[in-house]
């Protein structure tokens, strides 16, 4: 349980906290001297049942509001202090606005300094406070009258705080901690502290430290000021860490993460909760957890907007941010992350805005995955980071729906059906325009039909279609099941007459027609039909090899690729003992069909599934 204090400067937050816990949370000499909290202070209150309630004492002065914002991320409850003599003040409202915009935690009110006012003033302040709370959405907050220096109301407040229910945190999430302090301890080394927003951490784990961009090993843990082997979301945690980083490398706003993050977000799409009007492309101060950057807002529609950061932030879906004016005097709005994936164009298209509104309303990770998958292939690593899902949770989620998965990508059944239509239509057109070929290889079909889609998914879909009988294949060549070539009776007789002429060397159509004493056009038609049936293969127009020779050439290329990393014309020519021109024709044929690809003078193996008798 983590409770944050809130309230106007000099309303007795630190004094009451000391009365509750016995600890003065002001930790800086300047704070002691001024009598006000400047930075975040912490106090821990052990309970008889073994629990430890942690308090974050935030500054009340407007000048130090950025520090206050760093303290309210990840809290379970807020304790609002209002001095009876002053009543509700500017920073009281400011703190309530910030608490509302960062998730509206449950709230308790302590009226402080009650010994300084009479009953009439106390009644007046109670009414003022309850009306103010109602304005900000707290309709049933419990209120206590206290005078910390006299001990009035302190025990009743203690009893109430002890009975507060702990906030539950989702299971199966990655560990994520926002760093708010870093220091060194003699004999232990580097220590960082912060509030864990999700997941759990164990002694011995390796975490990724942003800012320093390096992995760090967890040597020791304190949770809620108690030594432990394991700590969880919702706790104040101190981590003794070691690795390639020093105290000087760490800043407030850095993160300790269970997984190395993707690139930090330069822009995100959010929903807004406005307390004041926002203008298009208005400059802002933007607060997230312990981070504070500047940026601008691009308004999209209703409460949807895009935030563009001057300094990138490590964000996840549903993270909350607070937007303040560029002079840092007014809290303007809260924002909740809808998606980290922001297209450069088309953000205001009705279809995309409808998707964003649905996504903003998604209640579960399964709902979010379904919506993303309705628009295109989903990269599971990207989705897993955005939702902060552990590997096990992500696997379970991806396996719970009707999805096609391959190599870290996921495709919905509806989109898979659409892709299948494209593949079949492309293959039908290929048969029409390349009647002399049995069909393309899977890589070539992918590049023709779905060139911009994730390769593993397309190839997995092609394989599924092959297994289901929607596609047929021979030696890796794909064709429609109905695409079958055959000889007429006269052509069959002619083929039987000439097939014995095909030895190890290729034939030109005109030469073979002359040799057999047949018309050239009739011979050309016959050889095209023979090629469709896989008996022969054209390396260039009208020049044919017996098909088993092409298979032998493919095996040679595999050998050269394995031994030398690539095939060059000279090696290929020498191995076959043929002329350079013929060697180049053969290699260019393999490039053309996608078995190899050319890089300078080299030919690299591309689709090894071709010329495979098992396929």
Regions found by a protein language model. Give the residues of each.
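C-terminal effector modules of nucleic-acid-centric enzymes and ribosome-associated factors
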Residues: 5, 106, 117-121, 128-131, ...
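Conserved nucleotide-binding/hydrolysis micro-motifs of P-loop NTPases
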Residues: 61-62, 85-89, 104, 113-118, ...
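G-domain G4 guanine-recognition motif of GTPases
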Residues: 83-84, 108-123, 143-152, 297, ...
């Amino acid at each position: 349980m983590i409770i944050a204090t809130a309230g106007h400067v000099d309303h007795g937050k630190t004094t009451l906290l000391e009365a509750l816990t016995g600890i003065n949370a002001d930790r800086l000499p300047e704070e002691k001297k001024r009598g006000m909290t400047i930075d975040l202070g912490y106090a821990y209150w052990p309970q008889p049942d073994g629990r430890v309630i942690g308090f974050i004492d935030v500054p009340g002065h407007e000048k130090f509001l950025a520090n206050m914002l760093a303290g309210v991320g990840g809290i379970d409850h807020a304790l609002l202090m209002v001095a009876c003599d002053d009543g509700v003040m500017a920073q009281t409202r400011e703190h309530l606005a910030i608490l509302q915009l960062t998730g509206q935690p449950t709230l308790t009110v302590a009226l402080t300094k009650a010994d300084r006012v009479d009953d009439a003033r106390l009644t007046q302040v109670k009414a003022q406070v309850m009306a103010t709370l109602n304005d900000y959405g707290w309709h049933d907050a419990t209120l206590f009258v206290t005078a910390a220096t006299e001990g009035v109301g302190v025990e009743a407040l203690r009893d109430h705080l002890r009975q507060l229910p702990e906030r539950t945190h989702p299971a199966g999430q990655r560990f994520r901690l926002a760093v708010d302090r870093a220091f060194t301890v003699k004999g232990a080394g580097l220590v960082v502290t912060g509030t864990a927003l999700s997941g759990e951490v164990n002694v011995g784990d390796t975490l990724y430290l942003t800012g320093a961009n390096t992995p760090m090993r967890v040597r020791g843990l304190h949770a809620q000021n108690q030594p432990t082997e394991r700590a969880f979301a919702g706790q104040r945690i101190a981590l003794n860490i070691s690795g390639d980083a020093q105290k000087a490398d760490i800043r407030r706003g850095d993160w300790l993460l269970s997984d190395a993050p993707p690139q930090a977000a330069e822009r995100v799409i959010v929903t807004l909760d406005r307390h004041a009007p926002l203008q298009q492309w208005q400059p802002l101060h933007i607060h997230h957890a312990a981070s504070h950057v500047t940026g601008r807002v691009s308004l999209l529609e209703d409460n949807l907007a895009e935030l563009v950061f001057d300094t990138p932030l490590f964000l996840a879906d549903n993270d909350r941010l607070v937007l303040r004016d560029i002079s840092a005097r007014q809290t303007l709005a809260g924002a909740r992350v809808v998606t980290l994936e922001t297209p450069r164009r088309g953000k205001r298209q009705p279809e995309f805005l409808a998707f964003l509104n649905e996504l903003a309303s998604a209640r579960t990770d399964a709902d979010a995955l379904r919506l993303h998958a309705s628009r295109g292939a989903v990269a599971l690593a990207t989705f897993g980071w955005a939702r902060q899902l552990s590997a096990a949770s992500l696997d379970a989620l991806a396996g719970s729906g009707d999805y096609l998965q391959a190599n870290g990508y996921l495709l919905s059944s509806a989109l898979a059906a659409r892709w299948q239509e494209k593949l079949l239509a492309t293959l039908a057109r290929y048969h029409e325009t390349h009647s002399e070929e049995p069909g393309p290889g899977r890589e070539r079909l992918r590049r023709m039909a779905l060139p911009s889609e994730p390769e593993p998914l397309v190839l997995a879909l092609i394989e599924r279609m092959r297994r289901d009988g929607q596609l047929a294949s021979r030696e890796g060549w794909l064709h429609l099941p109905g695409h079958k070539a055959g000889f007429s009776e006269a052509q069959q007789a002619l083929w039987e007459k000439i097939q014995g002429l095909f030895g190890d060397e290729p034939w030109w159509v005109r030469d073979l027609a002359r040799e057999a004493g047949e018309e050239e056009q009739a011979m050309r038609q016959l050889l095209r039909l023979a090629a469709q049936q896989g008996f022969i293969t054209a390396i260039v127009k009208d020049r044919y090899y017996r098909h088993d020779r092409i298979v032998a050439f493919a095996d040679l290329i595999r050998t050269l690729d394995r031994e030398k990393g690539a095939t060059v014309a000279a090696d290929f020519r020498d191995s076959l003992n043929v002329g350079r021109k013929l060697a180049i024709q053969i290699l260019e044929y393999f490039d053309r069909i996608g078995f190899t690809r050319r890089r300078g003078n080299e030919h690299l193996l591309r689709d090894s599934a071709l010329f495979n008798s098992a396929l």
